[in-house]
Swiss-Prot record:
Residues that coordinate or bind ATP: A12, Y13, S14, G15, G16, L17, D18, T19, S20, A39, G122
Protein's name according to its UniProt entry: Argininosuccinate synthase
Catalytic EC class: ligase
GO cellular component: a single term: cytoplasm
Main location: cytoplasm
EC number, UniProt record: 6.3.4.5
Biological pathway: Amino-acid biosynthesis; L-arginine biosynthesis; L-arginine from L-ornithine and carbamoyl phosphate: step 2/3
Complexes and interactors: Homotetramer.
Pfam families, per the entry: Arginosuc_syn_C, Arginosuc_synth
Catalytic activity: L-citrulline + L-aspartate + ATP = 2-(N(omega)-L-arginino)succinate + AMP + diphosphate + H(+)
Subcellular location per the Swiss-Prot or TrEMBL entry: Cytoplasm
Length: 413
């Protein structure tokens, strides 16, 4: 598809400097009508100003889409991922990764509604997000062209971006320039939604540097967290959390409430070096307070209700599932296949988990379920009437048979 074939473009638009520059660049470079989409994923920033900024850039009011998709995000993306207990490379709870397929889905839906030939995003050519956005868009509508300005334009420095903005009358906030109009050192590259906030860049680019305490925007430091522990109870049904302390909550409200608990008690900070899909290593710091609590609770209720072999197989599949999400394959048949298998294990994952929150730690202190496979008649250390300990002898000997045979053979040598 050539440039002249593109009449309408749907842009993932934050209202910030970079996407405002992209908006103008699309108008000039493609001579296309731009439609903006701003997602409210619970990032904690006011999204309505994006409407006025888009209109100020010449976008028709009917072409400005601002959608509150927090409930859909948590219910249809975050919760399914947590049923899998997904963690990438042992520590990353995939807060950015899981938001991208939903944004891609909305871009495609708006493009279909408005008859657009293309969608566009502000991800750079060095990161994972370009892959996530584009795999999602192409999986849902392969006829769409995806425009990635960072891979096309010559605006390859902060100075050139600011110069372009000045030239085209794009508003530049004080966080980007000093009192003389010169570029400031860029702030951390941050991304936030209801599940997490991430930080990259600046002194974090040296993996030896400890993050500054002022960087962390959500959580108290564990040292400054309350000196008294707090206990909460999370209720589960079909593998998803449905209540806190007996009160049923919507998915987004539940996650927001867990975030509040986690922030208060300094829970959910991680500092990792991860392997990006494009091949390089990158250092990132993340705050995932509610997700950290949720993961602990979910594993606890599964420990009561999942069959042993189903649980072990699920743990074996988890790294592959997490990798698919990290690399942008949410809409792939293999992810959907794994999801179906994971969801099949969750029908009896219900009950309550009691947790102790204290200075960065989440400790499980109790769990109950009407579907529990734990039977104290068998598990007791006291006298029981149901388990004949002599049965273990044959069980052990049969499982040791290969060792016995091999040992006899080896002893003959």
């Amino acid at each position: 598809m050539s440039k002249k074939d593109i009449k309408k473009v749907v842009l993932a638009y934050s209202g910030g400097l970079d996407t405002s520059i992209i908006l103008k660049w699309l108008q000039d470079e493609y001579n296309a009508e731009v439609i903006t989409f701003t997602a409210d994923l619970g990032q904690g920033e006011e999204v309505e100003p994006a409407r006025q900024k888009a209109i100020a850039c010449g976008i028709k009011p009917e072409n400005v889409f601002i959608l509150d998709i927090k409930e859909e995000f948590v219910k249809d993306y975050v919760f399914p991922m947590f049923r899998a207990n997904a963690i990438y490379e042992g520590e990353y709870l995939l807060g950015t990764s899981i938001a991208r397929p939903l944004i891609a889905k909305k871009l495609v839906e708006i493009a279909n509604q408005k008859g657009a030939e293309a969608v566009s995003h502000g991800a750079t050519g060095k990161g994972n997000d370009q892959v996530r956005f584009e795999l999602g868009a192409l999986a849902l509508n392969p006829d769409l062209k995806v425009i990635a300005p960072w891979r096309e334009w010559t605006l390859n420095s902060r100075e050139s971006l600011l110069e372009y903005a000045k030239k085209n009358g794009i508003e530049i906030s004080q966080k980007h320039v000093d009192e003389n109009g010169n570029p400031k050192i860029s702030p951390y590259s941050m991304d936030a939604n209801l599940l997490h906030i991430s930080y990259e860049g600046l002194h974090l680019e040296n993996p030896a540097n400890e993050p500054e305490e002022s960087m962390w925007l959500w959580t108290n430091s564990p040292e400054q967290a309350p000196d008294e522990a707090e206990y909460i109870t999370i209720g589960y049904k079909n593998g998803d959390p449905i209540s806190i302390n007996g009160k049923e909550l919507s998915p987004a409200t539940l996650l927001k409430t867990l975030n509040d608990y986690g922030n208060k008690h300094g829970i959910g900070r991680v500092d990792i070096v991860e392997n990006r899909y494009v091949g390089m290593k990158a250092r990132g710091c993340y705050e995932t307070p509610g997700g950290t609590i949720m993961l602990k609770a979910h594993r606890a209720i599964e420990s009561l209700t999942l069959d042993r072999e189903a649980a072990h197989l699920k743990d074996e599949l988890m790294p592959r599932y997490a990798k698919l999400i990290y690399q942008g394959y949410w809409f792939s048949p293999e992810r959907e296949m794994l999801q179906a298998a994971i969801d099949a294990t969750q029908k009896n994952v219900e009950g309550t988990v009691r947790l102790k929150l204290y200075k960065g730690n989440v400790t499980v202190v109790g769990r109950e379920s009407s579907k529990s496979l734990y039977d104290d008649a068998y598990s007791t250390f006291e006298k029981d009437e149901v388990y004949n300990q002599k049965d273990a002898e044959g069980f052990i000997r049969l499982n040791a048979l290969r060792f016995i045979i091999a040992g006899k053979k080896n002893n003959k040598k």
